[in-house]
Amino acid sequence: MRMGSLISTCLSSSKASSSARINDSSTWSPPPGQHISIRTFRELRARQTSSPIWRRTETPSNGESFRSMDDLQEGDNNQPMTLTPRRLTLEVSQRLLTSLGN
């Protein structure tokens, strides 16, 4: 397998009597020196207080975590974002193509 060609997607769900849990995640390994992971978590409960959570973590090859300017601007809005599995796959594909083009 060539570096930069790994794309994996995981979808799991479990149901209890009054709640459902859905985990969507997708990761890929771009060229050496870059690692980008996108993971979404969405939990549905009977209560109206639950809200979707979207988290993006980018880790350079030296292992340090950091937040991009986009992340910081998103934090200013302080509104969670939901990605459907189709939208998540589209985002991952676009980022992979961008990283391979550089």
Swiss-Prot record:
Keywords: Host-virus interaction, Inhibition of host innate immune response by virus, Suppressor of RNA silencing, Viral immunoevasion
Keyword field contains Lipid biosynthesis: no
A single BP term in Gene Ontology: symbiont-mediated suppression of host innate immune response
Keyword Cytoplasm applies: no
Composition skew (Low complexity), residue ranges: 1-27
Domain of life according to the entry: Viruses
Disordered: region residues: 1-35, 47-86
InterPro entries membership: Gemini_C4
Purpose: Pathogenicity determinant. May act as a suppressor of RNA-mediated gene silencing, also known as post-transcriptional gene silencing (PTGS), a mechanism of plant viral defense that limits the accumulation of viral RNAs.
Record family assignment: Belongs to the geminiviridae protein AC4/C4 family.
UniProt-recorded name of the protein: Protein C4
Source organism of the structure: Tomato leaf curl virus (strain Australia)
